[in-house]
């Protein structure tokens, strides 16, 4: 088992099925067809910060940040003053470097059914300063997924933890480019040094690879450590 260690800031997410790991909803057990081809990563578009989330009818963390004049700073690996987060990299997955699609890096499955559309779990990390209520951050965490086109999920999700810190998780399905996809998000709040760091873990895969995503999410839930 490989690991990547990082100085963390704002958003964390996670997946779960029937109370375990990232809240992933499944209607039937999928059948996967692994290949040995190295995938060309095609992640769901992810905002570099929570305040850049797409608008929609459901109130989001981005709306809370805007309406309360909170300052948000993107956090990258090695930034001074940020917590240390150790996220596991499950077998048959590999690291994703930081990029516009993976602002704080992430992981990608190396044996996908479609090499051009592999399952991914992408991280975003932010530092919030100002008049912040961590409970409000978690309260509005479900809004981003619920604003996805055709999203169907398990209500508003459920309270959780990651590495000993409070979190909120939600999962379900939505449609993109005519294909049904599984999506899940875990948002973690990490109070540290007069600020609140938010870690978002965004998981996304074609519906047929839901179980692959869930297995990776279970590893993340069980083995992640966070040191403020």
Curated annotation (Swiss-Prot):
The keyword Transferase does not apply. It is found in: Cell membrane; Secreted. Disulfide bonds: none annotated. A lipid is attached at residue 20 (N-palmitoyl cysteine). GO terms for cellular component: extracellular region; peptidoglycan-based cell wall; plasma membrane. Residues 28-52 have a biased composition (Low complexity). Gene3D superfamilies: Mog1/PsbP, alpha/beta/alpha sandwich (3.40.1000.10). InterPro entries: Lipoprotein_LpqN/LpqT-like. Its main location: membrane. It is a lipid-anchor. A lipid is attached at residue 20 (S-diacylglycerol cysteine). GO terms for biological process: cell wall organization. Disruption phenotype: Deletion mutant grows at a normal rate and has a normal cell envelope lipid profile, but shows altered lipid profiles during biofilm maturation. Mutant is attenuated in macrophages, but growth is restored when host CBL is removed. Residues 1-19 form the signal peptide. Keywords: Cell membrane, Cell wall biogenesis/degradation, Lipoprotein, Membrane, Palmitate, Secreted, Signal, Virulence. Residues 26-53 are annotated as: Disordered. Pfam families: Lpp-LpqN. Interacts with the periplasmic loop domains of the mycolate transporters MmpL3 and MmpL11. Also interacts with secreted cell envelope biosynthetic enzymes such as Ag85A. These interactions are weak and may require a putative mycobacterial adapter protein or molecule. Interacts with human ubiquitin ligase CBL. Involved in cell envelope biogenesis. May act as a membrane fusion protein, connecting MmpL transporters with periplasmic proteins, and play a role in cell envelope lipid changes during biofilm maturation. This is Lipoprotein LpqN. It comes from Mycobacterium tuberculosis (strain ATCC 25618 / H37Rv).
């Amino acid at each position: 088992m490989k690991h990547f260690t990082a100085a963390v800031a704002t958003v964390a997410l996670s997946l779960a099925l029937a109370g375990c790991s990232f809240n992933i909803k499944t209607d039937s057990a999928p059948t996967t067809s692994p290949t040995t081809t190295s995938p060309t990563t095609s992640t769901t578009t992810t905002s570099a910060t929570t305040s850049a989330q797409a608008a929609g009818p459901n109130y989001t963390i981005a709306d809370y940040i805007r309406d309360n004049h909170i300052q948000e700073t993107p956090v990258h690996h090695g930034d001074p003053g940020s917590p240390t987060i150790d996220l596991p990299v499950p077998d048959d997955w590999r690291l994703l470097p930081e990029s516009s699609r993976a602002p704080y890096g992430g992981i990608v499955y190396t044996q996908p059914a479609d090499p051009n559309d592999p399952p991914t779990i992408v991280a975003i990390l932010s530092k919030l300063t100002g008049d912040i209520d961590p409970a409000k951050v978690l309260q509005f965490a479900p809004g981003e997924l619920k604003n996805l086109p055709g999203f169907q999920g398990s209500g508003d999700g459920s309270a959780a933890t990651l590495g000993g810190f409070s979190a909120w998780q939600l999962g379900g399905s939505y449609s993109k480019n005519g294909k049904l996809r599984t999506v899940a998000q875990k948002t973690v709040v990490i109070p540290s040094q007069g600020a609140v760091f938010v870690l978002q873990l965004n998981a996304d895969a074609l519906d047929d690879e839901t179980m692959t995503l869930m297995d990776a999410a279970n590893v993340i839930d069980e083995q992640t450590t966070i040191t403020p």
